[in-house]
């Protein structure tokens, strides 16, 4: 399943691999087939390796990528561990080079049309609008005017509310990244994975309805 088909990518990090597997399974059962593991803690690569092995063995069709990558070395490390896509908060040409060499999709964080154009020149298929809360749907709509071919994925500033999702998709985004608004601290503390499963399903249904 592609980012366009899915319309949503859950974003998640936790240092506990066993808890991560439960999050992964809940998202999978809820209908998600893409997940971005955000590399934000010590030994995060070890956690990702466990999650990716679990997904390959137990969750057919689940595609894991890695976010919060800020240099080519980290991108190379995660690709060696099986990352299917790389998401970055910044536009860096060194990351573009290592991902393109391995034919792994990369999505750089961009905040201007100049950055977006440069990313596309470097082979980027979908840009990350970050932080989405700073720019908003109006920015996306403005970009899509002169550049209707540009695929945009906002993260930050995206919620599971219908009005929020409608605003983004009507502006022309390809998909959205959802972190704590979907996989909340409360869900993790209470280990309420059934609620997460239901929230993922409901959000995917909302996106489908908004797009139709």
Model-derived regions: residue spans:
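Short acidic active-site motifs
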Residues: 19, 47, 73-74, 94-95, ...
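Catalytic cores of alpha/beta
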Residues: 71-81, 114-122, 159-176
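Glycine-rich phosphate-binding active-site loops on the catalytic face of alpha/beta enzymes
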Residues: 85-95, 129-136, 172-192
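Short, ordered loop/turn segments at secondary-structure junctions
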Residues: 39-40, 69, 90-92, 111-112, ...
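Histidine/lysine/aspartate-rich catalytic loop segments that bind and position anionic ligands
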Residues: 92-135
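Conserved N-terminal beta1-alpha1 strand-loop-helix module at the mouth
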Residues: 1-73, 77-81, 170, 190-211
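Glycine-enriched alpha-helix->loop->beta-strand junction motifs that scaffold or abut catalytic
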Residues: 28-33, 79-86, 101-107, 121-126, ...
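Hydrophobic faces of well-ordered beta-strands that scaffold small-molecule active sites
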Residues: 7-12, 35-37, 64-67, 86-87, ...
């Amino acid at each position: 399943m592609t980012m366009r088909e899915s319309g949503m990518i859950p974003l998640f990090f936790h240092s506990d691999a066993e808890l991560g597997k439960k999050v992964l399974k809940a998202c999978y059962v809820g209908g998600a087939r893409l997940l971005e593991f955000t590399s934000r803690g010590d030994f995060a690569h070890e956690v990702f390796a466990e999650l990716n092995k679990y997904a390959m063995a137990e969750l057919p069709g689940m595609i894991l990528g890695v976010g919060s990558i800020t240099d080519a070395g980290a991108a190379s490390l995660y690709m060696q561990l099986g990352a299917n896509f790389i998401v970055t908060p910044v536009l860096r040409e060194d990351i573009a080079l290592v991902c393109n060499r391995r034919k792994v999709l990369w999505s750089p964080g961009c905040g201007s049309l100049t950055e977006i154009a440069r990313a596309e020149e470097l082979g980027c298929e979908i840009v990350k609008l970050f932080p989405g809360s700073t720019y908003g749907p109006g920015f996306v709509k403005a970009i899509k005017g002169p550049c209707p071919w540009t695929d945009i994925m906002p993260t930050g500033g995206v919620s599971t509310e219908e009005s929020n999702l409608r605003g983004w998709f009507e502006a022309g985004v390809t998909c959205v990244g959802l972190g704590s608004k979907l996989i909340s601290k409360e869900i993790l503390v209470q280990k309420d994975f059934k609620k997460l499963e239901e929230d993922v399903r409901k959000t995917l249904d909302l996106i489908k309805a908004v797009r139709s």
